[in-house]
């Protein structure tokens, strides 16, 4: 990796050349890291296949207003992510990599926002380091290769925050404010975020910018008057409101987001907004959904894992940034930029810590702030004649090595509990150990080299962890292969039904609607549902049922003649197989190995 430039430039030509070089470094290194992670692998978990299925339905039906999943209204997320995926499907075909491409592009855009902020507010070295620290941490790498909305939300909110803060960073008077054009642009970005994940796309950036601008404006009034009192605080609130132009931001947001929200509300008779706002916003905040719960420190602990390897130095960075903001270290623009990073990080962490439903990806919009803080303090430390806070440095390097050991141990333990044949993926844990040794060896010989070693460690570790290592782990994702076996049995595309449990993975890989014979759909369980499932099998040789093994006995009395278990696989972390039940035309027919006959 090229050395990170550290010295300020003195001419306009040199300045532009330095910016172009640092921009090219960020783009090239980010694309390389993201590309390594694009190993072909099936869609994971519940969200990826569900969202991809919604996008594919949009493309197939031409209805880009009302999201639908398996023939039902999908109310869990707004439409921007689905639009992005459907566009990628139209350009590159409906496969897993196309579904994940929008998240990767959004991650690159968020990295460029950090490059811009770090370069303008601190130095080109800080911009490069912040961008690559963001790309080269674990959770960002995972979300950059996931068919989910979080990376898109993070890019939109990061750009909105950076563009809104820029005019106020170096302002020395209370009259500084966003231009009308900039305020509308910030509002448009918030509108995209609202189209991506709902009200949080506006509430999050507004809370960050409002609190930060209020503090800056109050500080300006205190500096001018020499007094600290209610007048300065209240006056600062007014100055911040004027500076941010909230009405213009609101107009920009509504111009982007309101047309679709109005259209989907009209098309669904109010059903979509009722389900989304009442259930998936208020409901998720008030009570845990889908057993996603955690304590108040859930997101703090989760960030120490998700921001690895840079989390090894995040606590020190937060403490040092707080000291500089409180005690006046450095210039005013740098102090304000550090204050923005602290507020940015705190608002997202605290806000989602108060929510009853918790998932690590909820606070992904805080990760740009963490990257900016760590980069600013790391670059500054490299410029000192000796390392400040050597004990913290030692603790960080040791944590880096231990993180590698923990990575390997986690994979090895998981391989004994469902991740079959994944042991080789544990080798990715060697990278942080090697990186820690390199940082320690270079700490006094070349501080810039030590920082570059940490940057490379993050990029290589993250790229391999979400690429080749994840590809190895993906062999345990059994349901996609089971659905493909159903298609092979049908001699083309199977018509699938699930008894009694359906999953988004089955729906996506079914390439069509999957019928469901579930407990909640009938009065007489299991007889009524089993009889209906058996009737489905009689409808043709391309009809295949997916049944958990412990439900075969309930189904068996109702099955038609010449029925067999034509395939079975055990999904990840399940305690039983999922079976394919199909029909065959004569006694000698079979698919692959001889089927286990249920009825002759």
Show where each model-derived region lies:
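Membrane-embedded architecture of ER/inner-membrane glycosylation machinery
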Residues: 2, 8, 15, 184, ...
